[in-house]
Design a protein with these regions (language model features):
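Eukaryotic intrinsically disordered, low-complexity regulatory linkers and tails enriched in Ser/Thr/Pro
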Residues: 1-126
C-alpha cells in the first residue's frame, strides 16, 4: 500500500496561498510596499522563458514583482507575467509545480517548497 505523501499535500496547500496572493495582485495590484520574490525551477515542464534567460539561469531563477511588471495572469496550474530584462519586455510562464520559494518581504512572509532538481554546471542561485 502506498504511503500518504504529507510533504506533497502540504506543498500543494501552500502553493494555493501563492496562487491566491498572485490573484489578489492580478486584480488589485500590489499596494502598501508589497513585492513578491518568486524562485522557481527553470527546467520544469511548462516553464516559458526567453532563451537568454535559460542560459543565464539553467536551473533556478528568482523574479521580483514590484514596480515593473505587466499582464499578470493567474490560472489554477500556473501564472504568467511580462517582465523587463535588458530594457525589453518578455513574457514568462511558471507552473506552480516549479515553485521553490515565495517571499513578500514587506510583511516578512516566506514559503519554501521541496527542491528536487538535478544540478547542472554553473547553477546560479540568486
Amino acid at each position: 500500500m502506498k504511503k500518504i505523501d504529507y510533504q506533497k499535500l502540504l506543498d500543494n496547500a501552500l502553493k494555493s496561498v501563492v496562487k491566491d496572493a498572485l490573484i489578489h495582485a492580478q486584480f488589485n495590484g500590489l499596494g502598501d510596499g508589497a513585492h513578491f520574490f518568486i524562485t522557481f525551477k527553470t527546467r520544469d515542464p511548462g516553464v516559458v522563458l526567453p532563451d537568454f534567460l535559460r542560459i543565464r539561469y539553467p536551473d533556478i531563477m528568482t523574479i521580483v514583482l514590484q514596480y515593473s511588471y505587466n499582464n499578470l495572469n493567474v490560472s489554477d496550474k500556473e501564472f504568467g507575467v511580462q517582465l523587463t530584462f535588458d530594457g525589453r519586455p518578455f513574457f514568462i510562464r511558471v507552473p506552480f509545480s516549479a515553485l521553490i520559494e515565495f517571499k513578500d518581504p514587506s510583511v516578512d512572509f516566506m514559503l519554501s517548497f521541496q527542491l528536487k532538481i538535478a544540478p547542472s554546471a554553473g547553477n546560479d542561485m540568486e
